[in-house]
Structure formats: C-alpha cells, structure tokens
C-alpha cells in the first residue's frame, strides 16, 4: 500500500505542478508560479527518493561489499542541490517582479487553482498519515506532514492573491518567501543526508 500511496502522491503533484505553473504564467502571478515549481520539486524529490531507496535495498555484491545504502544518501544530496537551485531561481524572479510589479490577470483562475491545490494536498496528507500510522511508516507520516505544510502554503498564496489588489507587492513578497522556504527545505534534506552517513 505504501508504494501505491507514493505513486498516487507523485501523480497528484504532477497535476498540481502543471496546473499551478500554467495558471501562474497565464495570470502573471509569481507566487502561483513559485508554488507550481515547489510542487514540481516535490515530484522530483519523491522520484529521486523512490529510486534511491529502491537501489539502496539491493543486497551487497562484489563491487559494493557494504551494500548500496549510500545511493539513498546520494539521492538526498541530489535533491538538496535541485531544491537549492530552484529556491534561488524563485527568489531572483520574485526580486525582478518586485522591481516591476503588475496586477494579476484572471485572479479567479489563480484563486481556484490554489483552493484546488489546498484540497488535494489535504486529502493526500490524510491518506499518507492514515496509512503511515497503519503500516508504521515514518517516511509516509513525514510525507503526510509535508503535504499538510503544502496545504498552508496554498492557503497563504490564496490570501495573498486577494491582498494583491490592495498592495501590488504582495505576490512578489510571497514568491520570495516560498523561495526561502524551498532553500530551508534543501538544507534540512542535506542535513538528513549528512547525518545518515
């Protein structure tokens, strides 16, 4: 069941990433676009982790007498670098948007995609936490908590889209904060990878 939930989660994040990135571009919203990139990074992180764990479970062989567990650590470092680069890119784009602010086009579309994102992430959070507890999987519970954090991120962007009407810099400030959050996440994952050595 763990693998099934992981696959559903990856599929959900692919749909959310595509929706948010498209709507972010169409509506000229840096924060919605940044959230889309964040969802896309969740997909890459999940895939890298999935394959890293799969390889690390291989038994020891002639070339790897101590096993393959370091592949999982290597996957963690790769995720760290991807997230760090993404966070820095989002911060740069937010800064550019802050220098040249503009109103969000089609705000109803941007608002709709963020509410949809919050609902999907809440459903995924509940599923992961439920099955994580049922199957005693710390990884699944942790991923469920991560999905719950994504719910709050979507709601913050939703509120920001409403406030952007009153303060034009809201969107770029939120995109900047999302970029900082992604960088913070990259350091957390990097620390976990180092600690597991």
Regions found by a protein language model. Name each.
Residues 1-197:
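Alpha-helical transmembrane cores and adjacent cytosolic helix/loop segments
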């Amino acid at each position: 069941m763990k693998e099934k939930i992981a696959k559903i989660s990856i599929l959900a994040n692919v749909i959310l990433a595509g929706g948010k990135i498209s709507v972010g571009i169409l509506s000229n919203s840096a924060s919605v676009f940044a959230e889309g990139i964040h969802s896309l990074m969740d997909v890459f992180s999940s895939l890298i982790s999935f394959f890293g764990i799969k390889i690390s479970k291989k038994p020891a062989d002639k070339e790897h007498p101590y096993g393959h567990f370091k592949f999982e650590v290597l996957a963690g470092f790769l995720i760290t670098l991807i997230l760090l680069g993404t966070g820095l890119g989002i911060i740069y784009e937010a800064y550019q948007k802050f220098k040249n602010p503009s109103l969000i086009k089609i705000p109803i579309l941007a608002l709709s995609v963020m509410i949809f994102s919050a609902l999907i992430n809440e459903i995924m959070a509940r599923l992961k936490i439920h099955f994580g507890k049922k199957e005693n999987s710390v990884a699944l519970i942790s991923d469920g908590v991560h999905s719950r954090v994504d719910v709050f991120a979507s709601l913050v962007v939703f509120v920001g889209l409403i406030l952007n009407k009153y303060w034009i810099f809201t969107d770029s400030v939120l995109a900047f904060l999302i970029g900082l959050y992604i960088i913070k996440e990259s350091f957390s994952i990097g620390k976990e990878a180092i600690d597991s050595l």
